[in-house]
Amino acid sequence: MQKQAELYRGKAKTVYSTENPDLLVLEFRNDTSAGDGARIEQFDCKGMVNNKFNYFIMNKLAEAGIPTQMERLLSDTECLVKKLDMVPVECVVRNRAAGSLVKRLGIEEGIELNPPLFDLFLKNDAMHDPMVNESYCETFGWVSKENLARMKELTYKANDVLKKLFDDAGLILVDFKLEFGLYKGEVVLGDEFSPDGSRLWDKETLEKMDKDRFRQSLGGLIEAYEAVARRLGVQLD
């Protein structure tokens, strides 16, 4: 399956058309961004690590009954995916307090959230991805009530699967975001799951093993990503 025209270039991925109108090529680049793209740097091997990491996670979620857009790996940095009609709202699950939640509520980083929090954010870099709720989604027609309920159900199911997966690997799944789209009328998980869009801490040391290493200038970004992948059993070679 050959990629054709570039359809969209995001902060860290590029989407291409193929000869099949129902399939796309998703290319993971070495770019890493923070501050809604205000700061961008390149890290060797990052595209490869995130591509293979995402493929591994999407397969685990598919095995658990969560429909995903993943078809197959094409190369170290590319995968073939179903073309989705993407919902312009991202779903976030928080198992522990971190990031914007700590700033917004003035609570201590790391406290356990039981039950986990579920947040919705409008995907809009210019507006810094504002937080919204179900009422906004319905009023502005971003997603139907039924499809949003399905997105929420699948997000919580993914959380159950991934919390155990990471716990077994000695990691805490602090929080993560998921994006969904429609494929022939069905809600399907799209975009990616990687340390770019999740927070992962070492269970023993609470060391941050995700993109916060870049956001907070801690260093060792790729080393952390590769360490997480190895713990999970992701084949990087």
Curated annotation (Swiss-Prot):
One of its GO terms (molecular function) is ATP binding. Keywords: ATP-binding, Ligase, Nucleotide-binding, Purine biosynthesis. It catalyses: 5-amino-1-(5-phospho-D-ribosyl)imidazole-4-carboxylate + L-aspartate + ATP = (2S)-2-[5-amino-1-(5-phospho-beta-D-ribosyl)imidazole-4-carboxamido]succinate + ADP + phosphate + 2 H(+). Gene3D superfamilies: ATP-grasp fold, B domain (3.30.470.20), Phosphorylase Kinase, domain 1 (3.30.200.20). Its EC number is 6.3.2.6. Pathway: Purine metabolism; IMP biosynthesis via de novo pathway; 5-amino-1-(5-phospho-D-ribosyl)imidazole-4-carboxamide from 5-amino-1-(5-phospho-D-ribosyl)imidazole-4-carboxylate: step 1/2. GO terms for cellular component: cytosol. It is an enzyme of class 6 (ligase). InterPro entries: SAICAR_synt/ADE2_N, SAICAR_synt_PurC, SAICAR_synth, SAICAR_synthetase, SAICAR_synthetase_CS. The keyword Ligase applies. SUPFAM superfamilies: SAICAR synthase-like. GO terms for biological process: 'de novo' IMP biosynthetic process; cobalamin biosynthetic process. NCBIfam families: purC. PANTHER family: MULTIFUNCTIONAL PROTEIN ADE2 (PTHR43599), SI:DKEY-6E2.2 (PTHR43599:SF3). Belongs to the SAICAR synthetase family. This is Phosphoribosylaminoimidazole-succinocarboxamide synthase. The gene is purC.
